[in-house]
């Protein structure tokens, strides 16, 4: 992946800024991961393809109360479904059943072993059409890993404790900066470049096929052997402060 490297006080178009290559980012196409989930009979059988409202009454004489507990009963997703169905009514010709897939992205640091300091920054995907009670079970294996991002480990000498810091800029960034601008990057510039790195990684994950699946959707033979048309929506991205 390449990121643009500007310099404070140096005027140039963004397109003309030198590009710095960052290696070590491993990722899968999120659309392919979701398609596999829809095609799998066991996974698809637990998904809610038809959104709905959920209401609860304490007693016969009490007013009903709307319950908000799942993505597929939320106002936001219901509004998305209504807008899509309204657009489909104006489309001529035969139509397949169309539904919305709610993608949820999460990212955080994780340790790779009980001993040692090996770690990575993991980006994983949940499908919001699956109940949160199922997603909360580790045995459901509903979290799909879609990216492994580079990290750097820092040790505090006084406590001997380790902290995983994301993202990692290779040590060669100083040499690269010196070669192009004749100086080393400031702390603020390094923070900016880290911001560029995380957003560049997200562009790899949610760009291309992801954007096309949002605009045009995909036609997939689902786990019940029925062909359906689905459209993707990124309903949530949960990120730590380091990623902002």
Predicted feature descriptions by range:
Residues 1-244:
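Long, charged/polar, flexible scaffold/linker tracts and peripheral helical/loop segments
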């Amino acid at each position: 992946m390449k990121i643009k490297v500007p310099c404070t006080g140096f005027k140039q178009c963004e397109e003309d800024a030198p590009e710095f290559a960052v290696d070590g980012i491993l990722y899968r196409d999120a659309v392919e991961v979701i398609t596999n989930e829809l095609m799998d009979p066991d996974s698809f059988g637990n998904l809610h393809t038809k959104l709905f409202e959920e209401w609860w009454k304490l007693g016969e004489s009490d007013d009903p109360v709307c319950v908000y507990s799942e993505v597929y009963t939320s106002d936001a997703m219901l509004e998305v479904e209504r807008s899509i169905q309204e657009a489909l009514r104006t489309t001529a010709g035969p139509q397949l059943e169309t539904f919305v897939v709610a993608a949820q992205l999460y990212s955080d640091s994780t340790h790779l072993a009980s001993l040692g300091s090996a770690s990575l920054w993991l980006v994983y995907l949940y499908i919001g059409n699956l109940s949160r009670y199922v997603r909360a079970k580790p045995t459901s294996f509903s979290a799909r890993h879609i990216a492994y991002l580079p990290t750097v480990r820092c040790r505090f000498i006084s406590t001997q404790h380790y902290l995983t810091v994301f993202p990692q800029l290779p040590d060669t960034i100083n040499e690269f900066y010196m070669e192009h601008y004749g100086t080393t990057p400031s702390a603020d510039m390094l923070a900016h470049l880290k911001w560029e790195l995380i957003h560049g990684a997200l562009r790899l994950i949610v760009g291309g096929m992801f954007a096309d699946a949002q605009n045009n959707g995909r036609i997939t033979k689902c786990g019940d052997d029925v062909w359906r048309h689905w459209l993707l929506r990124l309903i949530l991205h949960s990120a730590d402060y380091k990623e902002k």
